[in-house]
């Protein structure tokens, strides 16, 4: 006889097995994080384009409008983010009001939306920088070492989801490009169309 008690535990991360969108999975991860750390009001991702040096706001999990929707900037024009890469370590700002340089647009936008603390984790794929993960809170001084130790696990898990998504897109683009090369030999017009689509 099967004992139902053996199956009583619910896997809090079972959403990772779903085939939903990356945003849906990040929102689900945010819900799991908030069960433990209610003060995490927003998780956001920026992606880095190595060819252009541009960071682009990609997605966020917050309930309100994204303060950085459609925002992009050269990494070279974001010295505090560039410093994260130089040091190879995440950045913790426990009180955004204390930031001396409020001249950057992204800092002003985050502040206007009521975020008081920020944790920024760089994301890598096999050693290559791919973007940043931001965890924001409306409360100051919440990112203690104990909290950060646990948030690192969630942060790296989300980074792996992003890496997986990027790999799938690159694979699809490579397949379309290969198909275009084959099609060029048989039908140049269709091959040119596939080149434009990839």
Language-model features, listed with the residues they occupy:
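Signal-transmission/dimerization alpha-helices at domain junctions
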Residues: 1-2, 15, 87-90, 126, ...
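Signal-transmission linkers at sensory-effector interfaces
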Residues: 1-27, 35, 164-178
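Flexible loop/coil segments at beta-strand boundaries within sensory signal-transduction domains
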Residues: 51-52, 124-129, 138
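Regulatory sensory and allosteric helical modules in signal-transduction proteins
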Residues: 65-101, 105, 109-111
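A short, aliphatic-rich beta-strand micro-motif
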Residues: 116-124
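… and, occasionally, acidic/histidine-rich disordered N-termini of signaling adaptors
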Residues: 169-198
């Amino acid at each position: 006889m099967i004992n139902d008690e053996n199956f009583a535990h619910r896997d809090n991360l079972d959403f990772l097995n779903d085939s939903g969108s990356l945003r849906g999975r990040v929102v689900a991860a945010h819900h799991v994080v908030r069960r433990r750390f209610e003060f995490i009001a927003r998780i956001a991702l920026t992606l880095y384009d190595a060819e252009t040096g541009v960071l682009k706001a990609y997605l966020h999990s917050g309930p309100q409008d994204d303060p950085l929707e459609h925002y992009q900037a050269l990494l070279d024009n974001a010295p505090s983010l560039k410093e994260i890469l130089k040091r190879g370590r995440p950045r913790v700002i426990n009180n955004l009001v204390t930031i001396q340089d409020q001249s950057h647009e992204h800092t002003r936008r985050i502040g206007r939306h009521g975020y008081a603390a920020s944790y920024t984790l760089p994301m890598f794929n096999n050693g290559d920088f791919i973007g940043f993960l931001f965890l924001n809170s409306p409360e100051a001084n919440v990112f203690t070492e104990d909290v950060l130790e646990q948030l690192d696990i969630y942060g790296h898990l989300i980074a792996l989801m992003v890496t997986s998504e990027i790999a799938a897109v690159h694979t699809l683009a490579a397949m379309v490009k290969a198909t275009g090369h084959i099609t060029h030999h048989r039908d140049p017009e269709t091959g040119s169309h596939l080149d434009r689509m990839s």
